């Protein structure tokens, strides 16, 4: 099991970090008391392989020694791949961020001014800062740059992996509303009008052979591939987690299924993270 503890001064980027880790498949828990870390790990063991926990200044043990002891014990746990990330920014940047957000600092309720609260937080979080495996100063980087740094550390590569979802649907059942791209295949030759192909789907070999023999179908698929390959790098750089490409035909049984499969197979061969979904076929085979 992998466990990442996210900490840092308030306003430095912990929330962004936790959101990125969630996108990367981590089960995330916000503001967990340090004393409950082992209980959480025991509860989630076998259910999740990757856990991320954020800790802020309100959830620390009573003493710095207790905090160090808990962290040391976690690091020595044989069944855990433990790492800790600490986020920080200079005092001027934190003051500016709080001024813009108009949020209260977690220590403000202790009658501290904002500047005093920021300094006090520095002292309280010192054990977490000094023992962190990764420290990121967010003073002069954007949210997107911070996200990329976290992904690079977690994945071992700079760009995060975009999930490409290819789905088919039938216009007569309603357009796919969750799609980023919608392409219409209703103008292409329709296997529905061929008696022996009508009861089949785009997943069946006779339908596939028929559509592969149609020049317009092949041309359309190649043009869609060219379009997606042209803009895919930009989508990846834009910090997208998913891009959904929907292909529609009249009923969602033949042409759209075939084209969605062809696109999915093409990008799968290129090493992309691909998912496929056939809305009409799922309805036809749904229980009840």
UniProtKB/Swiss-Prot annotation:
Keywords: ATP-binding, GTP-binding, Nucleotide-binding. ATP binds at residues 8-15. SUPFAM superfamilies: P-loop containing nucleoside triphosphate hydrolases. GTP binds at residues 56-59. Transmembrane segments: none annotated. The keyword Nucleus does not apply. InterPro entries: P-loop_NTPase, RapZ-like, RapZ-like_N, RapZ_C. Pfam families: PapZ_C, RapZ-like_N. The keyword Transferase does not apply. Belongs to the RapZ-like family. Displays ATPase and GTPase activities. This is Nucleotide-binding protein Tola_2941. It comes from Tolumonas auensis (strain DSM 9187 / NBRC 110442 / TA 4).
